[in-house]
Amino acid sequence: MSAGEISTPQEYIGHHLNNLQLDLRTFELVNPHDGPASFWTLNIDSMFFSVVLGLIFLALFRKVAKNATSGVPGKFQTAVELIIGFVDGSVRDMYHGKSKLIAPLALTIFVWVFLMNLMDLVPIDFLPYIAEHWMGLPALRVVPSADVNITLSMALGVFILILFYSIKMKGVGGFVKELTLQPFNHPVFIPVNLILEGVSLLSKPVSLGLRLFGNMYAGELIFILIAGLLPWWSQWLLNVPWAIFHILIITLQAFIFMVLTIVYLSMASEEH
């Protein structure tokens, strides 16, 4: 279904919630209007924008690092230094382990998630129109953090780090004891402890990923609803206030994802 064939607000909303998908069995693009896609599909628009935004982050910060001066810094260098100082201060306050990798990790998470969230402010029809009419693509979504696959993948990476630091600091035996002998320190309660600690451990990445996805999906959906239900000449009455408020949400969600990552890794690095 092309934009020209969309005749109702429901079709418009559904069209903008479809990802550009690749069928991994046939390596062909999936037509979102042919029915539900199979499990073996890849949301290549989410992957593309995630990688591009990550490369932009690396390029910009590398440029600042190479051109940094000890004199009066420029505006962009000042902004980067403020971000680095803010993230470094947050890590110092919340992380009590010895690893020196947490601050760079926190900086990467904060800026990368912020850039992905920032794509929500791109006009809702701009890039999809270009993709459809100039490139012949059936669909396009430009907000990677509104794709649950992206947010849960990032959360899975954090979860792997939690396991790594837990085993590194406590040893395999200490990690197993933590799962089986807490909160009830008696062998008879090992099954209960394992269930409680297992649920607690698994809930960290799940809640981390779903929280970011839910907030960004809701924000994207509101922009789509405004564009799909209101005439073009009145959309700015709601779009502008929501966009201004959404800037706060974009920044806050990146900050929350970073803070929870730091806290979880700090807990994992504690020696018992």
Swiss-Prot record:
Membrane topology of the entry: Multi-pass membrane protein
Record-annotated membrane-spanning stretches: 41-61, 102-122, 147-167, 212-232, 243-263
A single Gene Ontology CC term: plasma membrane
Location, primary (coarse class): membrane
Family matches, as CDD domains: ATP-synt_Fo_a_6
GO BP term, example: proton motive force-driven plasma membrane ATP synthesis
Subunit annotation: F-type ATPases have 2 components, CF(1) - the catalytic core - and CF(0) - the membrane proton channel. CF(1) has five subunits: alpha(3), beta(3), gamma(1), delta(1), epsilon(1). CF(0) has three main subunits: a(1), b(2) and c(9-12). The alpha and beta chains form an alternating ring which encloses part of the gamma chain. CF(1) is attached to CF(0) by a central stalk formed by the gamma and epsilon chains, while a peripheral stalk is formed by the delta and b chains.
Protein name: ATP synthase subunit a
Encoding gene, per UniProt annotation: atpB
